[in-house]
UniProtKB/Swiss-Prot annotation:
It comes from the Bacteria. One of its GO terms (molecular function) is 3-deoxy-manno-octulosonate cytidylyltransferase activity. This is 3-deoxy-manno-octulosonate cytidylyltransferase. One of its GO terms (cellular component) is cytosol. Pathway: Nucleotide-sugar biosynthesis; CMP-3-deoxy-D-manno-octulosonate biosynthesis; CMP-3-deoxy-D-manno-octulosonate from 3-deoxy-D-manno-octulosonate and CTP: step 1/1; Bacterial outer membrane biogenesis; lipopolysaccharide biosynthesis. Keywords: Cytoplasm, Lipopolysaccharide biosynthesis, Nucleotidyltransferase, Transferase. PANTHER family: 3-DEOXY-MANNO-OCTULOSONATE CYTIDYLYLTRANSFERASE (PTHR42866), 3-DEOXY-MANNO-OCTULOSONATE CYTIDYLYLTRANSFERASE, MITOCHONDRIAL (PTHR42866:SF2). Its main location: cytoplasm. Belongs to the KdsB family. GO terms for biological process: CMP-keto-3-deoxy-D-manno-octulosonic acid biosynthetic process; lipopolysaccharide biosynthetic process. It is found in: Cytoplasm.
Length: 245
């Protein structure tokens, strides 16, 4: 079983233009993501981009990159294009290009799960939420799972809704995915689904088509960079905790 990590990265962004090239303590964000992910047990790692500036930056810091179409609607679709070309890998790890604090253990946990579950098509991560404001925040996607740790639903709403008082844990979805290569290609050919579109969550397409997603719990939480404010949060966190690339 061979594992390929793919970091989809596009230049255009409605909230933070050119964010993969934003500087964080002397390095671009895409370099932070790449070099921290490179510490994992992946067999290979590549950035999939539609922009020559990002491509050149990755090559310049010693990474691998590939140019892809500008017509993709989400990261998984971009990854599927790479999967069509790189057929020697049977399992893919989708690493978000806007999460510079990624820990290699998160990637390794997905790798181990696929090694242990040969029939698994897709897996992802979750992190326990303790703060009520974080639970209510629609930018924190929540996930609920069955007793075997397969996703029942993902939502920007508070799920489960606390109609009665009870001892229940809330989990934030961490958007790092693992999939079998063939399933990524199959996913890319599925039509967008109603729940996916109303929640703006691409993983719901998988559930609506009747497939399962294994969800592993991680103790690591991430700060995704969608805005300038997020970027400043990451920079401050790195400084305060003396984190190195």
């Amino acid at each position: 079983m061979k594992f390929l990590g793919i970091i989809p990265a596009r230049y255009s962004s409605t909230r933070l233009e050119g964010k993969p090239l934003k500087m964080i303590e002397g390095h671009t964000m895409i370099e932070w993501v790449y070099k921290r992910a490179k510490k994992s047990n992946l067999d290979s790692l590549i950035v999939a981009t539609d922009d020559e500036r990002i491509y050149n930056e990755v090559i310049n810091f010693g990474g691998q990159a590939i140019m892809t179409s500008k017509n993709h609607t989400n990261g998984t679709s971009r990854i599927a294009e790479v999967c069509e070309k790189m057929t020697e890998y049977d399992t893919i790890i989708n690493i978000q290009g806007d999460e510079p604090l990624i820990e290699y253990e998160m990637i390794n946990s997905l790798i181990e799960t696929f090694k242990e579950n040969k029939d698994l098509k897709m897996a992802t991560l979750k992190h326990k939420l303790l703060n009520k404001e974080e639970i209510k925040n629609p930018n924190n996607v929540k996930v609920v799972c069955d007793k075997n740790d397969y996703a029942i639903y993902f939502s920007r709403s508070v799920i489960p809704y606390p109609r009665k008082n009870g001892n229940i844990s809330y989990f934030k979805h961490i958007g790092i995915y693992g999939y079998k290569r063939d399933f990524v290609i199959e996913y890319s050919k599925m039509l967008a689904t109603p729940l996916e579109e109303i929640e703006s969550l691409e993983q719901l397409r998988v559930l609506e088509n009747g497939y399962k997603i294994k969800v592993l719990e991680t103790t690591h939480s991430l700060i995704g960079v969608d805005t300038q404010e997020n970027l400043e949060q990451v920079i401050n966190y790195i400084k305060e905790n003396n984190i190195k690339i």
